[in-house]
Structure formats: structure tokens, C-alpha cells
């Protein structure tokens, strides 16, 4: 019988883990029965999907708790699984502060030779 994810979301993490253990035991029993031929066509398939659903909901709940625990911390201090997903080049790119920094020589040149804006009038 199919277990709904919404029903699992109402349970706690411990209860979901117990439920997953029950489903694993049921799946093992179904695999043993498979050899004798007493198992329906979709029984093993539904048991595997139920187990996947239970483990998915458990992971969601754990991540929700982690997000609450790390709320307000800077991105650099977050665990990698909670950081925003970026592609490789964006992960390696300089930050905005690093881009804005100038060397002493650059700052001196900028102050000595400011940008000249020419006005054009007819």
C-alpha cells in the first residue's frame, strides 16, 4: 500500500526512521516471498518507493532543522550542503569586495589623474 509523503511530513524524525526500518523489513520479507512466487507484481516496487519517500522526507526535515540552526550566519560559515548552488566559475570568481580593492599605486594614480569629463556645447 502506498504511503503518502504528506502523512510522513506530519511525523517526527524518529518516527520516520522507525517507519523506514519497518518498510526495510517488509521489503526483505517480500524479497524472500518472491522466490516462492507469493508476491504480487507491484508489491516490491511500491515498498521500494515507500522507502524512498520516507528517506526523502527524513532528509527534508533534517535540512529544515539545519536551516533554522544556521539562520543569520554568513554564507562562508554555512555547511556546504546549505550554501547556494553555483556553477564552478561562479564559485571561483572574486567577491565584490575583492574586485573593488586597489593597490596603493592604483589609488595614487587615480587621485593624481582623475577622470576628465569633457563638456561638448555648440
Curated annotation (Swiss-Prot):
Gene Ontology, cellular component aspect: cytosolic large ribosomal subunit
Cell compartments where the protein resides: Cytoplasm
Broad class of where this protein is predominantly found: cytoplasm
Coiled-coil boundaries: 10-69
A GO MF label: mRNA binding
SUPFAM superfamilies: Ribosomal protein L29 (L29p)
Lipid metabolism in keyword set: no
Protein name, per record: Large ribosomal subunit protein uL29B
Organism: Encephalitozoon cuniculi (strain GB-M1) (Microsporidian parasite)
Gene giving rise to this polypeptide: RPL35C
Amino acid at each position: 500500500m502506498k504511503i503518502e509523503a504528506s502523512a510522513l511530513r506530519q511525523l517526527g524524525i524518529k518516527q520516520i526512521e522507525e517507519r523506514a526500518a519497518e518498510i526495510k523489513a517488509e521489503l526483505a520479507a517480500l524479497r524472500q516471498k518472491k522466490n516462492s512466487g507469493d508476491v504480487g507484481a507491484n508489491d516490491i516496487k511500491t515498498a521500494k518507493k515507500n522507502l524512498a519517500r520516507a528517506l526523502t522526507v527524513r532528509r527534508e526535515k533534517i535540512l529544515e532543522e539545519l536551516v533554522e540552526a544556521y539562520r543569520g550566519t554568513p554564507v562562508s560559515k554555512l555547511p556546504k550542503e546549505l550554501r547556494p548552488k553555483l556553477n564552478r566559475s561562479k564559485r571561483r570568481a572574486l567577491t565584490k569586495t575583492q574586485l573593488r580593492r586597489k593597490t596603493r599605486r592604483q589609488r595614487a594614480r587615480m587621485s593624481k589623474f582623475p577622470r576628465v569629463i569633457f563638456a561638448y556645447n555648440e
